[in-house]
């Protein structure tokens, strides 16, 4: 039986026009399975996960394995109303592959296709992960014990598309590639009353304003200026009527840090300042902070050094050392469990990630596939 090579651009466009949100990627999962089952099956073992039904694991048996190498691709889309005007634009209003996960899946399928036809020396595990954008799919997968026995990787790799690099350029750095993130939700409760009689009430607008200014001292005065830390309070609300003193106020924000130590420091100071505000204003301040799986993506020093050296040494690969990004990625959770590396694939787009007009250059797909295949072959040649 002759098996036709994959039409990767066509597959990417199928993913793009049928985006699905986190934990709802059922059509995406079905298309992935269909493509994978069209490949030669003699080296492949496909594993589905009842506890995480849109996730998918595929194992490629190595010829003389010294290790098992994991490769992860995320599969979910974003709640963005696409405005690219492409012929293959999203057919689902309000949902779009605006973060390049359609590219990530397609690159992974291209790598998988190659090794399904050319047996690798080491075992390979391809993890198609749901719910990267929200709900921490990496945590859910790990907690479902999917990485066990022959599906347990010794090391993990993954890429993320970036419009800041030309199509096909690989970017990476030693240390942290993505910041860790924490959602911050604060609720202040006091005593409402008539605007004419403030002495009989406990105004939460005043307490809220004080708390906001105090929280902004954390990065200014508690964080080392040469280290990466951010606390942004992006949403506030209080009151309903101009002449009624508000009995409640809400603040929502996000913490970003390049190390987990930094994130924990900011979390601790948020808690302390909220407790102080509650005492100072004789009110209640409810503090909820959720990091989920969005730990800093801290690349393994040895594996990252090897990847950078290889990418720089191959004249067919264009490589650039990149600064850390303050955006989040839940691959950081997997790197807290397995050594590994994440790197960038340039897609040369003119619009930013998460933009309604994000339109990656499809030439990046094959260039990314070729670079990763070469790196994995080189990595496998090293032995144990």
From Swiss-Prot:
Coiled coil: none annotated. It is an enzyme of class 3 (hydrolase). InterPro entries: AcetylDAP_deacetylase (IPR023905), Amidohydrolase (IPR017439), Bact_exopeptidase_dim_dom (IPR036264), Peptidase_M20 (IPR002933), Peptidase_M20_dimer (IPR011650). Keywords: Amino-acid biosynthesis, Diaminopimelate biosynthesis, Hydrolase, Lysine biosynthesis. The active site is at residues 74, 133. Gene3D superfamilies: 3.30.70.360, Zn peptidases (3.40.630.10). GO terms for biological process: diaminopimelate biosynthetic process; lysine biosynthetic process via diaminopimelate. Pathway: Amino-acid biosynthesis; L-lysine biosynthesis via DAP pathway; LL-2,6-diaminopimelate from (S)-tetrahydrodipicolinate (acetylase route): step 3/3. It catalyses: N-acetyl-(2S,6S)-2,6-diaminopimelate + H2O = (2S,6S)-2,6-diaminopimelate + acetate. One of its GO terms (molecular function) is N-acetyldiaminopimelate deacetylase activity. Its EC number is 3.5.1.47. Pfam families: M20_dimer (PF07687), Peptidase_M20 (PF01546). Catalyzes the conversion of N-acetyl-diaminopimelate to diaminopimelate and acetate. Belongs to the peptidase M20A family. N-acetyldiaminopimelate deacetylase subfamily. This is N-acetyldiaminopimelate deacetylase. It comes from Pediococcus pentosaceus (strain ATCC 25745 / CCUG 21536 / LMG 10740 / 183-1w).
